Regions:
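Conserved alpha-helix/loop element of class I SAM-dependent methyltransferases that forms part
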Residues: 5-24
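Short gly/ser/thr-rich secondary-structure transition/capping motifs
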Residues: 6-10, 30, 74
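Structural signature of beta-strand start/N-cap positions in the alpha/beta core
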Residues: 25, 46, 73, 88-90
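Class I SAM-dependent methyltransferase SAM/SAH-binding core
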Residues: 33-81
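A short acidic, Gly/Pro-enriched loop at the edge of an enzyme's catalytic core
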Residues: 80-91
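A short SAM/SAH-binding and catalytic strip from SAM-dependent methyltransferases
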Residues: 90-98
Length: 98
C-alpha cells in the first residue's frame, strides 16, 4: 500500500476551514518567500505581506504570478512597527514566524 500525503493540499483545506477569504483584507506577518501569500491570494484574499528580510520580499515578488499582482502588496517591516490604522484588516496571519 502506498500512502501519499500532500502537505500543500492539507494547508489549503485548513485555510478554507478557518475563513471565507474572498475579498477579505489580510495582513500576513512574516511572509517569508511568499508561499502562503500566494495561497491566500488564490483563495481570494487581498493580502499585505510583511517580512523584515528584504531578500525574502524580493523572492516573494518574483514568485507571484502576474494575475495575482493586484491582490498582493509586499512590505519590508516587522509586526512591532506596523504603520497601519486600526481595523485596516479583516484577518491577520502569522505562520511559521516563531
Amino acid at each position: 500500500m502506498t500512502l501519499v500525503i500532500d502537505p500543500e493540499q492539507n494547508e489549503v483545506r485548513a485555510l478554507r476551514r478557518v475563513a471565507d477569504w474572498r475579498g477579505k483584507r489580510v495582513i500576513e506577518i512574516g511572509c517569508g518567500d511568499g508561499r502562503l501569500t500566494l495561497r491566500l491570494a488564490r483563495l481570494g484574499a487581498l493580502v499585505t505581506a510583511i517580512d523584515p528580510d528584504a531578500k525574502l520580499i524580493r523572492a516573494a515578488r518574483k514568485k507571484l504570478p502576474e494575475r495575482f499582482a493586484k491582490r498582493v502588496r509586499y512590505r519590508v517591516g516587522s509586526a512591532e512597527r506596523l504603520d497601519h490604522a486600526d481595523e485596516s484588516y479583516d484577518l491577520a496571519v502569522f505562520a511559521w514566524v516563531l
